[in-house]
Amino acid sequence: MSSGIGSLVKVIFKNFDVIAGPVISLVYPLYASVRAIESRSHGDDKQWLTYWALYSLIKLFELTFFRLLEWIPLYPYAKLALTSWLVLPGMNGAAYLYEHYVRSFLLSPHTVNVWYVPAKKDDDLGATAGKFTPVNDSGAPQEKIVSSVDTSAKYVGHSAFDDAYIY
């Protein structure tokens, strides 16, 4: 009988992250979120909204880098510790992490298009176009770049939808 209990304890310790992870990261926050919705206080609403936003970021990170994270042996335990810090009411980890890192990143202005170079105010379209006007051997601008387009040539090939096409 004692070997059965010992085996059970061994299995629980080996799979602690699998057992405790969903309870700590989903079940308790869900319960606390429902209680926060039903309460009149807005402080707990902010705590749990912040938690769910951070939990979503963690899950997106995991989904993106799953192949890399599966090679890190202690990642499940580190995630469990981080999630516990975010969830536990006395620590307010979610509020701290959001206020000090995520909020400052989201509210700071970001450069979206780093390759955009604005035109100068004194640029003249004619002067700019003159820089790229083709010139002939004497240095004078050419009259016409393309004189005419020959439209007399017809496509002689067949398509797969023609009746005369041989397969």
UniProtKB/Swiss-Prot annotation:
* Topology term for the membrane: Multi-pass membrane protein
Which keywords annotate this record? Membrane, Stress response, Transmembrane, Transmembrane helix
Q: In which tissues is it expressed?
A: Predominantly expressed in flower buds.
Q: Which GO terms describe its biological process?
A: hyperosmotic salinity response; response to abscisic acid
What cellular-component terms does GO give this entry?
membrane
Instruction: Tell me yes or no: is Mitochondrion among this UniProt entry's keywords.
Output: no
Q: Which compartment or compartments is the protein found in?
A: Membrane
The record's disulfide annotation reads none
Ranges that cross the membrane: 18-38, 47-67, 68-88
Q: What induces it?
A: By abscisic acid (ABA) and salt stresses.
Q: Enumerate the InterPro entries for this protein.
A: TB2_DP1_HVA22
Q: What is its main location?
A: membrane
Q: Into which family does the record put it?
A: Belongs to the DP1 family.
Q: What is this protein called?
A: HVA22-like protein b
Name the species this protein comes from.
Arabidopsis thaliana
What taxonomic lineage is listed for the species of origin? Eukaryota, Viridiplantae, Streptophyta, Embryophyta, Tracheophyta
